[in-house]
A protein has these predicted regions:
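A cross-family signal for key residues in well-ordered alpha-helices
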Residues: 19, 51, 115, 142
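Charged, amphipathic alpha-helical coiled-coil/dimerization segments
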Residues: 3-6, 82-140
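Residue cluster at the C-terminal edge of the helix-turn-helix DNA-binding motif
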Residues: 39, 86-89, 151
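Residues within the DNA-recognition helix of helix-turn-helix
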Residues: 76, 80-83, 144
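Alpha-helical linker/hinge and terminal dimerization helices associated
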Residues: 28, 32, 70, 113, ...
Length: 165
C-alpha cells in the first residue's frame, strides 16, 4: 500500500521471496498441466474439478459451490464443465430445489479417468514438492499457505472473490 510519502516498496528480502514464489508457482502449474495433458489429456484445473466432484456426496455438487471450492470464476467453471461434458466425464442437471441452479455430476467415465490419472498426478506432486522438503518444511509450507489463503478470502457479501464473478 502507498502512503503520502509514496509506495511502501518491498525490501530486498521480500522481493527475493516474491520472485521465488512467482517462479515456483508458475513452474509448478506448468509441471502439473504438462503431466496431466500427457497422461490424461486434460489440464490441471479439469483434474481438480473432477477431484472436487469425486469427493462430493453422490459425486454431485451445485455449480456455484464447485466454483467456490475450485476458487475460479463462474464463467471459467462453465467453460470447463462444458469441455468435461463433451468428454463424457461430467454431466449437468437442473437443481431440484432451485430452478435457476445446476448441479455438476461426475459420470462413471469421469470416475474412471480420475482413477487412471491419479497415480501419475500424485507422483508429479510428490516429485515437485514433497520429495524436496523435509517434514518440518512441509508443516511450515502448509501453515504459510493456509494463512495466505485465509487472508485472500475476506468475509462479507461484498468481497470480490472469483466464484462471485
Amino acid at each position: 500500500m502507498g502512503s503520502e510519502d509514496g509506495p511502501h516498496w518491498l525490501s530486498a528480502e521480500e522481493q527475493s521471496v516474491w520472485q521465488a514464489y512467482l517462479q515456483a508457482t508458475t513452474l509448478l502449474e506448468d509441471h502439473l498441466d504438462r503431466q496431466l495433458q500427457r497422461d490424461a489429456g486434460m489440464p490441471h484445473i479439469y483434474y481438480a474439478l473432477l477431484v472436487h466432484l469425486a469427493r462430493a456426496p453422490h459425486h454431485r455438487m451445485r455449480m456455484t459451490r464447485l466454483a467456490q471450492n475450485a476458487k475460479i470464476t463462474r464463467s471459467r467453471l462453465s467453460h470447463a464443465i462444458a469441455r468435461l461434458e463433451r468428454h463424457g466425464w461430467v454431466r449437468r442437471e437442473d437443481c431440484p430445489s432451485d430452478k435457476r441452479g445446476q448441479n455438476a455430476i461426475l459420470t462413471a467415465e469421469g470416475e474412471e479417468v480420475l482413477r487412471r490419472s491419479a497415480p501419475g498426478h500424485v507422483a508429479a506432486v510428490r516429485q515437485a514438492i514433497f520429495d524436496r522438503l523435509g517434514p518440518e518444511q512441509v508443516t511450515q509450507l502448509g501453515e504459510i499457505m493456509r494463512v495466505l489463503a485465509e487472508g485472500l478470502q475476506p468475509d462479507g457479501s461484498d468481497a470480490d472473490l472469483p466464484w462471485r464473478r
